[in-house]
Amino acid sequence: MAYLLTFGIIAALCLASISLYRYGNIPRQHILVTLSVLTAWCFSFLIVFTIPLDVTSTLYRQCLAEHKLALDAAGNASTTANITPPPECQEPWGMVPESVFPNLWRIIYWSSQFLTWLIMPLMQSYLKAGDFTIKGKLKSALIENAIYYGSYLFICGVLLIYIAVKGVPLDWQKLKAIASSASNTWGLFLLILLLGYALVEVPRSLWNNAKPGFTLQYAYFKAAKLSTDKAEAEEHVDDILESLQCISRVVPNNHELRPCVETIMRKVPIELQERASRNFSRTGGSGMGATSSTILPSEKALVRIHKQVIKSLQTLQRTEALWSVQVDTVLHLEDVARNIHSAERRFKSEFPRQRTQLERIFYSATLQWYWECLLKAPFLKTLCVVTATMSAMVVWSEVTFFSRDPVLSIFANVIYLAKESYDFFTIEVFSMMVLCYFFYCTYSTILRIRFLNLYYLAPHHQTNEHSLIFSGMLLCRLTPPMCLNFLGLIHMDSHIIPERMMETYYTRIMGHMDVIGIISNGFNIYFPMCMLAFCLSTWFSLGSRALNALGFQQFLQNETIATELVQEGKDLIAREKRRRQRAEEAMARRRDFNRPDPTVASNDYMNKYRSGAGALAGSRTPADGLLRDGDGSFDYAAVASSSALGVPRSLSEEINDRFGVSTQMQVGFRGTSELDPDYEAENERRIVGPPPRGLFDDV
């Protein structure tokens, strides 16, 4: 009967694995980072998938208790044997023994708390440290976290002193309740911020995505901003690498700090090193490192520049990847705008990519036209109406879930109606739908959060390890209060509605939707008001307007800056299209020139036998032998060679003959595979092997 729980565990593991594969770069990141983030994401998803089973299990236990009381009351009221007993309770789907959920929640709770408060912060600080030994990295990580957690301990000490002054007796259970309340307080207020934004932004983004014109304008705007970010990242990398070039020239090869310099240099790609060397030679070292060009750096200076190199290279790699993805998005939207009025009803792309056999069968050009140009917009508008209705229900229930009599929460009323008929299937499906919407709103906001440009989850394997760990910490800290909030909405938190229903196993282990006693007075008033205030501010785009006023450009219609950035994005995309067209033409010419012509070889073969019989032995001209018709043997390689035939060689062949094939240029774009699939496949074959060292790569 535990098949639903097994299915939930498998679904959580699959979803976490797919998400980690999409955002992370598993072959290149350390195994400890992969396992920690996978565990954090899997446990967070598992909580969401398992809560409905705990709810139905609790309702079933309450049904058994009520059934027993009804039987006892019927037996006491009459001694006759003809009294009809009350209907028996039916077990819900996926019923498990009573000991399963308490043990499961304990494992998830303590593992998540251990990861989010101890392991992952230390791992994050370890990755950011610029030291060159394990001991140095651990020391820097411990110092950074000691400062971070020291502030928490100071606040906890103040709270304990306050409680002691109030005369409240303290024991282990009291301290555990205080810690749980503090964690819930932090999580609930962060949840207010995320849900207040997402409950409005999710339906609005679906509606805007149904408008091709708006989507294309916004894509141009994002392209302009990404181009600026990419230029700033490149400039920052050049400045840091110029300082690194100064240090590399100053530190001699036999110096004790030379291995540290080599460790930093190994982090920098070869092309960036060559560009930095050219810039250094051109400027004569007059950049950032010129003032200390004759002074040997200290180990602390090398640690500092090592940390800067790691951070700047990660930012550059992420901005380049996002720029490539954004260019592909804009080109696709332009293709949609171009094909929307097509009479052929076949989707044609300006830069077609290689399609697999399955794509050509199940997603042909005709099907793609019907989806992109005809069906996608109505589908997104329908989803917008559904999500807007769900958002309105969530906001209303958040505002009214503290009302015990009458019950005003929509979600609580649905659970009560299903409970009266013991319709556990409806309860499970409804709970899963609501939790999945909570899950999508909260986690989609986390995935798109851009905290001071340090942590950002970029798809297509472009997310660094720091951002993955940060997202795992947020999920572990937000999931318990999010589920407690849901249990409060359906009136199954005994600390909010004590007389309604039995307590779930989840609230027994995870705690209740309580807050610190100092701020608990009036919580049922300002909690809904904060939720409503954030929703209204998102509806009127107050946050975007404030950021725009502070100089952080936001996409606001009828704004001069936004219009200028849209036009700049159009120009950048037009330039990128011309560059891709030139690259495709150059590759096509190169492939055509290097492809041997079978007609030339056959003509040379026939001329050899035609001229061999009638040629005079004594009449030789300077041109004789150019076609190698004097030999008895036939050299196919020589015949097929363009140089043997007297055809002028190209510049690339001349360079290859003089300096070797390794000097030839490959024209292409990072992140695109449609230009030359053979070249991309060769690159993939070349980089296959053991992944580079990650966490302990400096040791």
Curated annotation (Swiss-Prot):
Region (Disordered): 669-699
Sugar-modified residues: N76
Main location: membrane
Compartment list: Membrane
Disulfide bridge map: none
Extracellular side: 1-3, 52-106, 166-181, 403-426, 489-514
Record's bilayer topology term: Multi-pass membrane protein
Family stated for the protein in its record: Belongs to the LIMR family.
UniProt-recorded name of the protein: LMBR1 domain-containing protein 2 homolog
